[in-house]
Amino acid sequence: GLWKSLLKNVGKAAGKAALNAVTDMVNQA
């Protein structure tokens, strides 16, 4: 349903943001 796809999109965006944050930390280390 709508909520399931919304949660999936939010989870995907959060995962991408977390991955970017980790990559930035590694690059600065």
From Swiss-Prot:
Q: Which InterPro entries match?
A: Dermaseptin_dom
Q: Which UniProt keywords apply?
A: Amphibian defense peptide, Antibiotic, Antimicrobial, Secreted
Check the UniProt entry and state the signal peptide residues, or none: none
Tissue-specific expression: Expressed by the skin glands.
Q: Where in the cell is it found?
A: Secreted
Cellular component, GO, one term:
extracellular region
Q: What is its main location?
A: secreted
Record-level GO BP terms:
defense response to bacterium
Family, according to the entry, reads as follows: Belongs to the frog skin active peptide (FSAP) family. Dermaseptin subfamily.
Outline what the protein does. Has antimicrobial activity.
**What name does this protein carry?**
Dermaseptin-J8
- The organism is Phasmahyla jandaia
